[in-house]
């Protein structure tokens, strides 16, 4: 790392210590399983241990990236030379921004996967002829989570919370960054333009080419969007906790 970048990174570290973050942490070790359970529940217990921890890790990771981007926002606004600013953005800002923008979709998907598995296991308390017919991991979608979770009161409150994570509003506000990043060319962060030419096919099949651009995502506009998503993820975690506690309450009575 050259001297100029090192000096800028020190500014970032200093700026980060001064940030008063609104990003609360998702909790750990919040549930209590019965001391004695049948071996039948080993799968549920192991899944719950991993899923609750990793969901919290993912949400807290998003919170850290938001804090880092907030600090970088205060640093780059004081860099006047555009070439120097671009170098800092490429080196430090882009990695955090790219991960942060993608994380809400990741977290939503992990919720869907985790809830489907946990509710499927917990359904053993409700179904006398329980069948282990959950789809394979690679094919668990939201509709599958609905199917295996809809008999639980907690899920009825969790589902609308999940629907606010990485939703169409977020997709539009970030210029469809996640989809374009993985399949085409995503918007730039702070500086630069993409999609200078767009191919359009009309309803009549007529093809046209449109000259234009997609402007960069500025941190000043991106950070409130990410903070809202982080809050949505935390709200969903609260509902997830309620669902799990509902599971545990029933499991404790039956087994």
Regions found by a protein language model. Give the residues of each.
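Amphipathic alpha-helical coiled-coil segments
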Residues: 48, 52-69, 100, 226, ...
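Conserved aromatic-histidine-acidic binding/catalytic patches
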Residues: 43, 50, 54-57, 88-103, ...
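Long, low-complexity or tandemly repetitive, helically biased scaffold regions used
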Residues: 57, 68-84, 204, 210-212
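Helix-loop junctions and short alpha-helical segments
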Residues: 65-70, 76, 84-104, 108-161, ...
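Secondary-structure edge/capping motif, primarily at the C-terminal ends of alpha-helices
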Residues: 73-87, 118, 188, 247, ...
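Acidic, Ser/Thr/Gly/Pro-rich intrinsically disordered interaction regions
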Residues: 1-48, 136, 141-255
